[in-house]
């Protein structure tokens, strides 16, 4: 996920070094009933998706039942097969982390052309199948890190899954004080029709981690180097992505000393609700008038500490 507005946040190496050393993937906070979750990501679009997915795969509070790939097309350097690129990276992450048994169906390569016509895909079919297996009274959580094409296509193809879903979307800008929304945001622009379906669907549980809130989670390259570089496997894979990705749209910080971890924020908030503040608000004025949930504040220090702990050796 890419944004054009970045907020500087300082993190010191001292914060990292005081954490107890752990090996990747060690369960330190066992949960009897982890959150049943599908992650849907436009992974190849940016850098933070990779960090978020890897972090989630190490989290015992999250029971990842699937990792689906998403398209994007508004980036001027978007490849013709954007979803294929996301799919490739998803599969590489799963392999590096020994998680290849987790299903990784591919999503649609194009956005919805209107609010009534879905884009069928393996990912949409997978979401339907998983949702239909959910026992009465329970829900399947979806974390959307990119455009909402796959999830909304699943809903349109099989509306029976609506009461079985808890949809969590990373997108929009939102002003808490004035209760005003802006849809001029990267994920939303990559499938505005899909987002409108989410907003306009009665009885769909819908929660948003806005760009306004998630922009505050900023990682420093020096800290990530100490945490991940030279460790092999997923650690070096993540560092390589940071170092080789061309952040062409950003005029400042050409050395890429910091990176905004939008996607990490939503997954940390789902795993650790105590690290975020949530509020019920009204939908945008041009959508069905109903209440949805919005994360209005995050504990940046707490989320960083969780990330460091998960990846420390």
Stretch-by-stretch model annotation:
Residues 7-313:
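N-terminal acidic, glycine/proline-rich low-complexity segments
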């Amino acid at each position: 996920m890419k944004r054009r507005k970045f907020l500087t946040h300082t993190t010191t190496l001292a914060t990292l070094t005081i954490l107890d050393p752990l090996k990747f993937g060690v369960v330190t906070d066992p949960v009897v009933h982890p959150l049943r979750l599908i992650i849907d990501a436009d992974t190849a679009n940016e850098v933070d998706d990779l960090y978020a997915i890897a972090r989630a795969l190490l989290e015992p509070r999250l029971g990842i039942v699937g990792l689906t790939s998403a398209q994007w097309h508004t980036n001027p350097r978007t490849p013709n097969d954007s979803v294929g690129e996301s799919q490739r990276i998803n599969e590489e992450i799963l392999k590096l982390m020994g998680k290849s048994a987790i299903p990784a169906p591919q999503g649609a390569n194009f956005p919805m052309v209107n609010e009534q016509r879905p884009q069928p895909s393996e990912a949409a079919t997978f979401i339907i199948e998983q949702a239909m297996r959910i026992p009465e009274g329970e829900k399947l959580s979806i974390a959307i890190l990119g455009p909402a094409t796959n999830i909304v296509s699943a809903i349109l193809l099989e509306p029976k899954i609506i009461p079985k879903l808890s949809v969590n979307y990373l997108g929009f800008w939102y002003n808490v004080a004035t209760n005003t929304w802006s849809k001029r945001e990267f994920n939303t622009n990559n499938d505005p029709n899909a987002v409108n379906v989410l907003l306009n669907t009665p009885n769909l549980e819908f929660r948003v981690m806005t760009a306004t809130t998630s922009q505050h989670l900023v990682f420093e390259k020096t800290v990530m180097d100490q945490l991940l570089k030279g460790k092999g496997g997923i650690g070096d894979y993540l560092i390589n992505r940071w170092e080789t990705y061309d952040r062409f749209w950003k005029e400042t910080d050409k050395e890429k000393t910091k990176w905004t971890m939008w996607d990490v924020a939503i997954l940390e908030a789902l795993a650790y609700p105590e690290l975020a503040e949530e509020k019920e608000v009204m939908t945008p004025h041009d959508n069905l008038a109903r209440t949805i949930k919005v994360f209005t504040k995050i504990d940046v220090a707490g989320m960083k500490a969780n990330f460091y702990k998960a990846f420390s050796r």
